[in-house]
């Protein structure tokens, strides 16, 4: 049955990286050398927990329990979950409490929030499998919807996810791919046959024993998502101040089957501070939606509801992502220092695997986190301020220096054959 009023699919990305400490050249090769700034990582996590995670989870708990047609979805990176255990067990407990409501879906991603999908199918599959297992251990769910790091997506990746056993995948609704199509409509990737070598690697490492017969693509409605995530407190924006009833009007007028609002969870309380009214805005939405017959559904529910709909093809021959105005890989792989850093890291894969040393493997994987490369971005113009806001370093070159010293130390730790 087709509904004239679209559903809302709310998905939140929850991630905190391990930021590199001020590594000196003289530190390289020291037996007890630690790559990450323990104090800074702890302080940032606890600050964001107080401003965002704990108050937002408490509000979400209230909303999902009060409103029968209000459900949400999260993707929690493996490194975020580790920081919960190290720095804030109460944050993890609040997510587990949400899971017990039965109205929250947890998605799969790469464990280390890594760029492994760009470099190594084997590593990518192993990280996804590790993440699926961790989500099951902590929340009792086996994720069947996949979202790649930074919403990086391509036709090939969609079919890799299908072969891993996933029924759905999230992607950015990029204008240059959509052309005149509505991102709220259901989509599928084009028919695509992966090389046999790739298929064999996936079968060896995948989280589920069987491939899915098909995979649906849920596209982020970036305009409506960014109205909340980026523009909510912008006094120069024509839509300021944004009220819940106005936003609901925009949602209802946007058409299609499911309005997919995907954003960082830190939108609430961290990027948009409490004094902007962001929590009051969030609190008001479910009641308005209930009055107007709008349901907030999980990604799995949205895909099930679209079974009777004709699905458009979302054809992404090259990678798209949810970063910056370009919505491509340039936030992590635009300049020479970014490309060199990632290339040199993955040149070590064979030697790291041969060493069969869990600590060495963990260090290598921790350096794959996308944030390390994001901090090396030298973009300016429209996106420069965003990159500066998120970076803990004074410059992209400082990010590269710290990463290079960690990489040099890692290289020295590999046994010489």
Where are these regions (language model features)?
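An acidic- and aromatic-residue-enriched active-site/binding cleft used to recognize and process polar
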Residues: 13-17, 77-79, 111-114, 140, ...
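Active-site and substrate-binding clefts of carbohydrate-active enzymes
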Residues: 2-51, 65, 187-192, 197-199, ...
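A short acidic (Asp/Glu
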Residues: 20-23, 83-88, 118-120, 149, ...
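Metal-dependent polysaccharide deacetylase catalytic core of the NodB/CE4 family, i.e.
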Residues: 76-150, 213-233, 256, 260, ...
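Short, well-structured secondary-structure segments
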Residues: 5-12, 18-120, 144-147, 167-172, ...
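Catalytic domains of cell-wall/extracellular-matrix polysaccharide-remodeling enzymes
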Residues: 129-188, 267-285
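Acidic, His- and aromatic-enriched active-site or binding-groove loops in soluble protein domains
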Residues: 91-108, 129, 141, 162-209, ...
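Generic structural signal for well-ordered alpha-helices
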Residues: 57-61, 92-96, 125-135, 158, ...
């Amino acid at each position: 049955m087709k509904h004239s009023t679209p559903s809302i699919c709310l998905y939140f990305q929850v991630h905190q990286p391990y930021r590199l400490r001020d590594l000196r050249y003289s530190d390289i090769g020291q037996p007890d050398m630690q790559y990450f700034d323990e104090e800074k990582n702890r302080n940032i996590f606890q600050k964001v927990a107080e401003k965002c995670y704990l108050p937002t989870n408490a509000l979400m708990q209230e909303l999902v329990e009060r409103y029968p047609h209000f459900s949400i979805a999260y993707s929690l990176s493996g490194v975020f979950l580790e920081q919960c255990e190290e720095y804030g067990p109460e944050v993890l407990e609040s997510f587990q409490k949400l899971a017990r409501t039965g109205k929250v879906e947890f998605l799969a991603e790469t464990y280390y929030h890594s760029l492994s999908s760009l470099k190594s199918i084997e590593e990518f599959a192993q990280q996804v499998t590790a993440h699926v297992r961790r989500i099951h251990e902590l929340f009792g769910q086996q994720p069947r919807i996949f979202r790649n790091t930074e919403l990086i997506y391509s036709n090939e990746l969609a079919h890799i996810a299908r072969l891993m056993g996933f029924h759905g995948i999230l992607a950015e609704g990029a204008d240059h791919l959509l052309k005149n199509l509505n991102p709220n409509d259901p989509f599928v990737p084009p028919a695509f046959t992966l090389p046999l070598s790739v298929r064999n690697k996936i079968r060896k490492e995948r989280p589920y024993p069987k491939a899915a017969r098909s995979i649906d693509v849920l596209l982020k409605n970036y305009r409506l998502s960014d109205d909340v995530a980026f523009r909510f407190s912008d006094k120069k924006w024509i839509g300021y101040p944004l009220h819940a009833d106005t936003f609901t009007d925009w949602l209802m007028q946007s058409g299609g089957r499911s309005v997919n609002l995907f954003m960082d969870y830190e939108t609430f309380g961290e990027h948009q501070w409490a004094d902007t009214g962001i929590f009051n805005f969030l609190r008001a939405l479910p009641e308005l939606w209930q009055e107007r017959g709008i349901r907030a559904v999980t990604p799995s529910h949205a895909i099930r509801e679209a079974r009777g709909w004709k699905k458009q093809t979302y054809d992404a021959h090259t990678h798209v992502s949810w970063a910056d105005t370009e919505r491509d890989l340039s936030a992590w792989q635009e300049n020479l220092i970014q490309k060199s850093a990632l290339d040199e890291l993955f040149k070590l894969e064979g030697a790291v695997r041969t060493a069969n040393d869990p600590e060495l493997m963990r260090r290598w994987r921790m350096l794959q986190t996308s944030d390390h490369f994001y901090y090396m971005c030298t973009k300016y113009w429209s996106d420069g301020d965003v990159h500066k806001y998120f970076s803990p370093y004074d410059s992209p070159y400082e990010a590269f220096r710290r990463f290079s010293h960690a990489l040099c130390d890692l290289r020295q730790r590999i046994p010489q054959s």
